[in-house]
Amino acid sequence: MEELQGYFEKDRSRQQPFLYPLLFQEYIYALAHDRGLNRNGSIFYEPLEVFGYDSKSSLALVKRLITRIYQQHFFLSSVNDSNQNQFVGHHHTNFFYSRFYSQMISEGFAIIVEIPFSLQLVSYLKEKEIPKSHNLRSIHSIFPFLEDKLLHFNYVSDILIPHPIHMEILVQILQCWIQDVPLLHFLRFFLHEYHNWNSFFITQNKSIYLFSKETKRLFRFLYNSYVYECEFVFVFLRKYSSYLRFTSFRTFLERRYFYGKMEHLQTEHLIIVCCDYFNGTLWSFKDPFMHYARCQGKAILVSKGTHLLMKKWKYNFVNLWQYYFHFWYQSYRIHINQLSKHSFHFLGYLSSLLKNSSTVRNQMLDNSFLIDTLTTKFDTAVPVIFLIVSLSKAQFCTVSGHPISKPIWTDLSDSGIIERFGRICRNLSHYHSGSSKKQGLYRIKYILRLSCARTLARKHKSTVRTFLQRLGSRLLEEFFTEGEQDLSLILPKAIPFPFQGSHRERIWYLDIIRINDLVNRL
């Protein structure tokens, strides 16, 4: 029990007690402004295009916001004024600034709460002497790991991490490393008013997209803290249920430290939960051959154990979310499949284990005999059906895969339209370069090529045949030669390599740090 207590309390000494005064420092919002404009400025998140960021990010506006935000129904009164006086300049200005205030304070808060993480990240990298290699951030780096480890595993569990979580639980998660009560109180109040704003905004305008996009960084941070708390308990169960020291999770956690997403967690009540709901089944989790990988809200858990063992882990996750996070989670959302018979969808690929049998004839003097060998190969394929569904959601084609025009892009120039479609194709080719069979990707390129032609024809009120005849070679160059150009730069010229057979070669790029937008829609 002492070891358990120390495991949960080992990070409590790093709590930050004085963060609330930083809300009144002007350089915090200048930093948020710079990170919003700089594509490589953020340590923890991808670049974010923020609505309304300009020179108005000043300390005076922040003080005015914090004064007015504590007034009752500040956000809702601003929305009411805007809806009742949509064409009156003064009220429209108040509506704009209320959105701008909420956006600015959320970005500033996100910058402030990143400070303890940055300090922890720097100290951890120095302590563990981890090299600052950008290859550790690559999403594609997980596939060589799976290719090396999954060949002898039996089962895989597809896990969908539930969301949204209650706002109060999100605040409680932060209490373990932030002792600043005013800051937590302000966050709780801001989330409450933000929730009221969204409820009213959805009712009146049937849309929440713009406002939710403005505060994307803050809620992504809160989501990461929630996900890590789930994994914190999972790693504890995995670590203390086996007598063997495992290394896979250590590598995984080190990569999370490099990402800068290792968060301290609330430790109170966790011990009670573990004793009540997990203590009786710890003996059955003695499986040293287990690996876990997650990206965003989807995770996989692979094991060399039995189906019964995987079911125990399944209900372990269900109990965690139901009893600790008070989230009703249906067990059918966790699928358990046998690797030798089923494929699993992860990170935009359909992965499976292929078994190939070969027969070797052995001749020894007058005796000859046949030897049958069975080899297992980790295979990754392009999920064509899922990509077509994603393209249909983005309005590039129908659900059946029939290309359609993109009316929203008809205001662009011809070169701009071609460049946008070509960039989508290049990104897809780059991301799915690890597929062993790329014929399905050619179909996706064909859909985008014809959708581009239909968009140009719609813009000029002409036929598709006319634009295919006029720009056929150019479209062919944009949509079909990009993969060959990449291969010609990567592979040595001394090695003969016919591009006609390049669809079977798998290449993993170590510069991909985010999922393709079309893949992310799945």
From Swiss-Prot:
- Entry GO terms, CC: chloroplast
- Give yes or no: UniProt keyword Glycoprotein: no
Presence of the UniProt keyword Transcription in the record? no
Q: Which molecular-function annotation in GO is an example for this chain?
A: RNA binding
InterPro entries, per this entry?
Domain_X, Maturase_MatK, Maturase_MatK_N
The text of the family note is: Belongs to the intron maturase 2 family. MatK subfamily.
- Function noted in UniProt: Usually encoded in the trnK tRNA gene intron. Probably assists in splicing its own and other chloroplast group II introns.
Which HAMAP family does this chain map to? MatK
Question: Which protein are we looking at?
Answer: Maturase K
Query: Origin organism of this chain?
Result: Pillansia templemannii
